[in-house]
Structures are given as C-alpha cells and as structure tokens.
Amino acid sequence: MERIKELRDLMSQSRTREILTKTTVDHMAIIKKYTSGRQEKNPALRMKWMMAMKYPITADKRIIEMIPERNEQGQTLWSKTNDAGSDRVMVSPLAVTWWNRNGPATGTVHYPKVYKTYFEKVERLKHGTFGPVHFRNQVKIRRRVDINPGHADLSAKEAQDVIMEVVFPNEVGARTLTSESQLTITKEKKEELQDCKIAPLMVAYMLERELVRKTRFLPVAGGTSSVYIEVLHLTQGTCWEQMYTPGGEVRNDDVDQSLVIAARNIVRRATVSADPLASLLEMCHSTQIGGIRMVDILRQNPTEEQAVDICKAAMGLRISSSFSFGGFTFKRTSGSSVKKEEEVLTGNLQTLKIRVHEGYEEFTMVGRRATAILRKATRRLIQLIVSGRDEQSIAEAIIVAMVFSQEECMIKAVRGDLNFVNRANQRLNPMHQLLRHFQKDAKVLFQNWGIEPIDNVMGMIGILPDMTPSTEMSLRGVRVSKMGVDEYSSTEKVVVSIDRFLRVRDQRGNVLLSPEEVSETQGTEKLTITYSSSMMWEINGPESVLVNTYQWIIRNWETVKIQWSQDPTMLYNKMEFEPFQSLVPKAVRGQYSGFVRTLFQQMRDVLGTFDTVQIIKLLPFAAAPPEQSRMQFSSLTVNVRGSGMRILIRGNSPVFNYNKTTKRLTVLGKDAGALTEDPDEGTAGVESAVLRGFLILGKEDKRYGPALSISELSNLAKGEKANVLIGQGDVVLVMKRKRDSSILTDSQTATKRIRMAIN
C-alpha cells in the first residue's frame, strides 16, 4: 500500500507525467514486448543489472544453516530479509564463491563419464597442432557434415529408447531395445552411471550427443570428418585458412572411413565373381568392421559413397537420388530428358551405341576436389562453370562434363580403338569407354573442342585447351569460377532396384550407380575389417588364402568329413576352395586334381585307409577340374612368398605342418586350428588299410586276378581270396573270413600285416 500511495503522489507531479509520456518507452508495443510472456527478452542486460544488486540470488531457507552470515573478509553473504513473494532467502554472489571453496565436497567421478564428449574434445584440442595461417581465396562448398565427434550411430528413435532406459528406468512406456549396439550401450551406461548425482535431464542431453549423429549443411573448404568440423571456425574464414592436425581420432570418423574401404573391396571382388549380386550380399553379411556387423552399420550410417550406396541398394535400403558418373555426383536441378538409343562413329570409325539424353537439363556436379554447374541440351554442352582446388582437378571435371554432354566433337576426338574392360574382363559400356579414353589423354579432346572470346564477368575467368587460365579466351562454353558449387543439401532418399551386375537404377530406370563408378583408390582402414567370406581371403595375399582355406576345413571338419565320403563332387565345388586355385600353378592344376581325387577314391574304397590329416592337406587341390593322367606326385607345389613351395603328400613341410602331440596344424608357421578328433582313429596313416572281416595274407598274388575295389570285395564268399588296392596304389592279397566273431582282432593285426606285406 505504501508503494502505491507513493506512486500516486509521483504521478500527480507534471514532470513525472512528462518524462513518462515524452520518452519513447511509452510505445505500447515496446512495453508489451518487454513485459509480456515469461521469456526473458534481453538476457544479457537483465543479468548485468541483476548482478549489480547486492543480493541477486534466491536460495532455499536451509542455506542459512550451511553458510555463515559473513565470509573471512567480513562481507555479508545473505540478507535477513525474505525474498518478496516466496519463502526463500536473498543471497549474495559472494556466497557462491564461499560455497565453492568451503562447501561440502561431492564425488566428481561421474562428471567425465557424463560430459565425455566435452572431456574428449578438450583432449583432442590439447594434443592437436595448429599450423600457420595462409591468406588466400577460400573455395568453400556447402556439404552435409557430421558436427558431433565421438558418437555411436543410433537412429533418433533407438537413442531415445536407450536414454529412457538408462536415465528414467522406472518411467512408464514401451521401450524396445533390439539392436546389438542398443543393448551393449544400455548395459555399459547403466554400470557407469550408478549413483550418479547429476541432474537426469543433463545426463539425457549428454547421452544424446554420444549416441546420435548430428549433421549440418556447412560451407567447408578442407577436411570433412567430424574432428575437423568441430574446429571449423578456427581453421577457415572468408579469405584465410589455418592448418590444423587433430589431436586424436574418433570412432565415428573411423567407422565412416573403414566402411568406405570395406565396401569398395567388396564391390570390386563381387564384380569378378559368377553372380556379383549374390556374392556382394554374402560378403556384406559376413563382414565385421571394428567388431560390428557391416549390415548393421550400413543400415545406420548416412555416408554417401558409390560403393557404400551399391551395398545399401543390394540390401534394399533407400539411397540418394543423385547419380554418379566419372567419380562426380550429378544432381539434376532443372529440365528433363528422354533417352534414345543412337549409333555414333568415333574418330577411328568404330561404331558405338549410346543412350542419348534428348532435352534441356541443368546439373550440379560435385566431386572430392572440384565442383561444377552444367547446362546442356541434346548432345550439346551449353555452359559449364567449374571451380576446383587445382588445374588437375578442374581438368578432370571438364573431361567428365564433355563426355557427359555426348557432343559430336568429343566422339570424333577418339583416336585408336576403344576396348577398355572391367575387372571381370567384360567390355565397359560406351559412355565409360569414352570416359576412360579421355581420362588417359584429353589433348585431342581439348584441341578439337573449340575456343571463344569471353566477356569480363566478376569472379569468372576463361580456361584454354592447355588448361592455363585466360581473361580473353576460353574453351567453348567453359568458365572457371572462384566460387564452389554446393553439394545437394536434401537428405531425401529414394527406392532403387539393383540388377545381377550391381547396376543401381531409380524407379524410372535411370542408372544411378554401377561398379565402374567405384573408386580404385586404395587406403588403409582405421578399424579392423574382418571378412569372413572366402571371397575376400585373397585381399591380404596368397599366404592369407592358404591359411584361411585350411582354417575353414578344420572349422567345418564334421560336415566336410561326411561330404568327403558321401558327396565328394559337391564338396569339390564349394566356393571356399576357389581362392586356393590361384595359388596352384596353372599347368598342373588339372593333373594335381585328378591325382588327389584318385587317391581319395582309393581311400573311400578300402575301408580304414581314412587319414584325416592327409585328406585335409590335399582337399583344396581336388577342387580344380580334374585331368585324367597316370601321373604320380610325392609333393604338390603352391605359389606363395613369391616362389613355389612344396606340400608333401606324406609328412610335414613348412607349408603344412601337423603336430601329432598337440594335434594342432600350422600353415606357413601360422596356427590354423586343432583337430578335435584323433586323426589316428585306430589307423596309422594310409598304409594301415584295416579291412574288417578280411584276413591279410601277404603281397599281391597275380593268380587271384586284377586288384578289386572295396565295393567289389563285398561280393566275395566266405573263405574266398582276392587282391585289393589300398592307399598309395599298393596291392595286397586278402581272404574273406569264415567266422564273424574274430572281426574285432583284424584292426590290431591288419596294421602289422600290411607293413610286412608291403615291405
């Protein structure tokens, strides 16, 4: 009441009224702006004048018991007057200082865990190195980049479920934690955050940073991995750049990088197999990157790269609607065209069948090192505006655009025959034939293209056929610009189809991607890539093929053993033996195979001549198409370590060494696994042909006719004698027993008798 009375008195004075009405604050709109709603309209100002007051903070009454009235300097820390309109106490900012110095200490153990992404960022910056600043024009192009280093790749929905489960486990609501990564993260975080005193909302925000990829469409001139983007404001301005080397790597960048390498290797390998699509899927499903299944990564990771997109398309995932040609991503920004087959003649009078795009179209072209805007009509380039890092990159973009334009003068510039093939030795399609031809040498193309005088336009210059800049003349329709062309910003994905040869088409039938577009660049992956598929064994060279083949046989020995005796042809045709064939000298592949198959047939025919170690050792050689020959071998050659190495038919060698005591096999000195069963199963190698139910009488006896196989043996009557072929082509004389009771003793005596009979 006191206050109101005072105000009334003030208002009765004319001066007060004048000040209030003449100054501009009486605009109703302004008053409304600053007084309506709970949202603070000028936080900085508000903070300034609040902090200028003696007691700007309010606190719970209990604070009086916990903080003295004055600090060591005798300054008052809290006021005895209550806060108007609440039962809280007015407190001075000095109280905060006192509390920080003398207040109760709480455990800090959870802070680095909750604020993990911040702590890691500090470490990266501490160990990073900033180089000199260079002043130059920055060709920045907007790209979709990852702005959040150190995250897992969960979808927003998956992350939400994990966060609810970790932070608010008792809240109601259905949560589905299905993927492996969700379960692992939930378990890990629950353990880490036990008894955590940090506000749950804060924890939830921080978890979101850790789990979800956040992308922004930003102008970038240099590296695009997240550890560079987090310092974008420090490394590039409008006219300057500062060199920077990150002080650490983060898993999400490593995953992106390794995924691209794995996908490229898989697409390249699939291209040369009999059924590329089936092979590609088999490899994607059996590959792990940094211990996580590649198919799981593909489902979550937004990386757009040609090989990665081919793998996604094969899995039935949607991909970007832009298409790829010559390593550039093309996005049509306006116009339309229809496709017609046309036959054209090259400068060498070779006929090419090309699909001509009829109609006016505009495209953006974005590559790693150059970007461009292309306007074209039917088989005519109207305008190409290029920008790039250097002369070489600009030239690459110009060649791709000229070929893409399908102009007559480009086709006539071909010298010599076009016969480029892909990895599977199949001819490339005509457009890629042309592209390869000019990528090798574009001199004639540039010379024949034609030049024109140019107008002086800001930010644009001409480029001559020898790729030097000029302000007077330029290649017809081509200009070089200082400004880059932004990447296509939309994240829209479309349904695509993929054919057997890995050509990806949109629903209109336009080819978006094909294996020809997959880069040949080789890199070293940051995370371990484990290719379980036999098709990828050769990626690490011949030794890896050898070790992997034998490891595979040992791991699958139970099923291999049954197939070996019941359905050998099916076993020989297994794709796991395919890579091995490249190690066997071409000239002897068929002979080796015929020899080993005959040997195996003898083992099958003569009961008990089954020798596990020898079957494992020789099995891969039987996979080649066999040649019938009388050749006998005591060793087989494989090409590893740059020369032929021998595998002995009997006994150990550096290539294949079986240790009877430990029952372990080493191949080229590398452990290839253990045999779970005893290879000596009552036999002592091939010579111990244990013929149950037969008595071994001695050496071959010609009077009893030619040597029989095991199936013929079963027709003998009791007491009848015959010659039998065993093991390595040795023949012995046997007699079918008259009584069945003594069959058991055969096993023990046969071994000794065969030795005597043979020697």
Curated annotation (Swiss-Prot):
It holds the Pfam family Flu_PB2_3rd. GO terms for biological process: 7-methylguanosine mRNA capping; cap snatching; DNA-templated transcription; symbiont-mediated suppression of host gene expression; symbiont-mediated suppression of host mRNA transcription via inhibition of RNA polymerase II activity; viral RNA genome replication. A motif (Nuclear localization signal) lies at residues 736-739. The keyword Cytoplasm does not apply. It is found in: Virion; Host nucleus. The keyword Iron-sulfur does not apply. Transmembrane segments: none annotated. InterPro entries: Flu_PB2_2nd, Flu_PB2_6th, Flu_PB2_C, Flu_PB2_CAP-bd, Flu_PB2_middle, Flu_PB2_N, INV_PB2, PB2_helical. Plays an essential role in transcription initiation and cap-stealing mechanism, in which cellular capped pre-mRNAs are used to generate primers for viral transcription. Recognizes and binds the 7-methylguanosine-containing cap of the target pre-RNA which is subsequently cleaved after 10-13 nucleotides by the viral protein PA. Plays a role in the initiation of the viral genome replication and modulates the activity of the ribonucleoprotein (RNP) complex. Influenza RNA polymerase is composed of three subunits: PB1, PB2 and PA. Interacts (via N-terminus) with PB1 (via C-terminus). Interacts with nucleoprotein NP (via N-terminus). HAMAP family: INV_PB2. Belongs to the influenza viruses PB2 family. This is Polymerase basic protein 2. It comes from Influenza A virus (strain A/Chicken/Hong Kong/96.1/2002 H5N1 genotype Y). The gene is PB2.
